[in-house]
């Protein structure tokens, strides 16, 4: 049995200051998601679905989509307001789509097998893809999902605060996800949640966090649809930036007793570009991976 890789690439990248999904960061101009796709294919994934903004397809196809389509099946799903339930009136001031729950849901018509979900602008590491691929092969058809957890200390930025789903596990299963929106790496090395102001709550640097690397079966789409509808019905008219987030959805489904989530651990290194200032570090790390033989000289060959 194969598996599909769903890549969420429709985010605006407001903190980064540009469209980071298609910013060339590798030594040959490779974009970050090309590394994830390369790792996924060698792990066994046989299909890629890009979730993108309308208007991005031609650019993404020319950068990497057409080349990848020679190796695995490729589809494009659009995250825009046309997929929002008809009962919801979209405020004129709203420009952003409705978050990661919405992003996964718009890919529904393109997925009929177990699938992994990732962000386009994160580097997840080679072993993480083989680990989740193996787990996807044994997921129960209904009521079970999985996720790859990363150490909090390996996912913060020196250049500003980050948002992370801080996880707690019991007997290997995810028990709680706390979506923490303003995590700061302090000058003294401490990591704090400053969402309610500084100095903020001290966080465990070894705590596992969600980087939106999830594994699901198609059963989840019905639950996503119900959850998004409930979210929109409860949304205030002036909440023009509110997002429906995947970690919060998973947390609620777990506590309703509808979902069990075995948490996978990995020694893979994560890095990403939340801010433009993160770019030189990411470029240097990718260069090292090529030079050490983790990747060939070019992913474009």
What are the roles of these predicted feature ranges?
Residues 22, 166-170, 263:
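A structural signal for short hydrophobic beta-strand segments in well-ordered beta-sheet cores
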Residues 3-17:
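A phosphate-binding catalytic loop at a beta-strand-loop-alpha-helix junction
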Residues 126-214, 218:
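Conserved core of the sugar-phosphate nucleotidyltransferase
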Residues 60-64, 132, 224, 282:
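Hydrophobic packing residues within well-ordered alpha-helices of enzyme cores
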Residues 1-7, 27-117, 124-125, 129, ...:
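Conserved N-terminal catalytic core of the sugar/cofactor nucleotidyltransferase
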């Amino acid at each position: 049995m194969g598996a599909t890789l769903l890549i969420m690439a429709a985010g605006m990248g407001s903190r980064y200051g540009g469209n980071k999904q298609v910013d060339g960061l590798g030594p040959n101009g490779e974009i970050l998601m090309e590394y994830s796709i390369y790792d996924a294919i060698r792990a066994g994934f046989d299909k890629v679905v890009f979730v993108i903004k309308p208007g991005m397809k031609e650019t993404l196809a020319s950068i990497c989509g057409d080349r990848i389509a020679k190796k695995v099946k490729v589809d494009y799903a659009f995250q825009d307001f046309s997929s929002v339930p008809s009962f919801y009136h979209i405020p004129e001031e709203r420009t952003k789509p409705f978050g990661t729950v919405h992003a996964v849901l718009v890919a529904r018509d393109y997925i009929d097998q177990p699938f992994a979900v990732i962000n386009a602008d994160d580097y997840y590491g080679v072993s993480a893809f083989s680990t989740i691929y193996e787990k996807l092969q044994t997921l129960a058809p209904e009521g079970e999902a999985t996720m790859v957890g990363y150490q909090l200390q390996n996912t913060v930025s020196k250049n500003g605060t980050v948002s992370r789903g801080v996880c707690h596990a019991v007997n290997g299963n995810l028990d709680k996800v706390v979506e923490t929106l303003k995590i700061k790496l302090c000058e003294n090395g401490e990591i704090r949640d400053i969402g309610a102001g500084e100095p903020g709550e001290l966080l465990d640097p070894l705590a596992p966090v969600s980087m939106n690397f999830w594994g699901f079966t198609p059963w989840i789409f019905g639950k996503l649809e119900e959850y998004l509808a409930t979210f929109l019905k409860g949304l205030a008219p002036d909440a023009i930036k509110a997002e429906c987030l995947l970690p919060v959805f998973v947390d609620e489904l777990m506590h309703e007793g509808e979902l069990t989530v075995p948490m996978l651990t990995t020694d893979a290194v994560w890095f990403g570009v939340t801010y433009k200032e993160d770019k030189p570090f990411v470029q240097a790390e990718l260069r090292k991976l090529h030079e050490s033989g983790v990747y060939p000289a070019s992913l474009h060959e």
